[in-house]
Amino acid sequence: MVPIDMMSGENKTEEYLAKNPLGRMPLLELDDGTCIAESIAICRYLENEIPDPPLFGTTSLEKAMIEMWQRRMEFQFLNPMIDIFRNTHEMWKDRIVQIPQAAEIASEGVKEQMVGLDQELEEKEYIAGGGYSVADITAQCAFVMGKAAVGIRIPENLSNLSDWWSRVTSRPTARA
């Protein structure tokens, strides 16, 4: 694993752009030089190479439910957190036209979605039901980004969501 410092623009170097012309992260470079970009594409590749534990499910129903929840976590949390970050963080001020109102709208939407997810987690330990899955990973990444980049935190009164957060962040892989 080679860490890339996005804050200093390492992902915009000629060397990195040769591997991923969009300059985005993450990027998985295989031993043969093949480069795979985009989180879910990388996760699917790794799942096929190392299928245990199955993060995308094993039955048709599990796969569909996990995919459904993964997409919801992407649309309801990850994408809005990215929008908030891009429209408020100093790092982006000379890279894009920042629209503070877009960040405010996204932030309000995230808060509303947290209430809904808290209710959803009332009857289950993990987002897609069953065990830990890529849906949990997507949500976890969104909340890590939200907390680190723009200070968004899970409110304490959302006890189901807070309990879920404690479960996923206490996993050994969360500390790796």
Spans of model-derived segments:
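GST-like domain detector, emphasizing the conserved glutathione-binding G-site
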Residues: M1-E104
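Generic structural signal for individual residues within well-ordered alpha-helical segments
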Residues: L17, A64-E67, T138, S162, ...
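Short beta-strand(s) of the beta-wing in winged-helix/HTH DNA-binding folds
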Residues: P26-E29, I127, R175
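GST-like fold's C-terminal all-alpha helical module
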Residues: Q70-S170
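Charged/polar, low-hydrophobicity segments characteristic of intrinsically disordered regions
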Residues: S170-A176
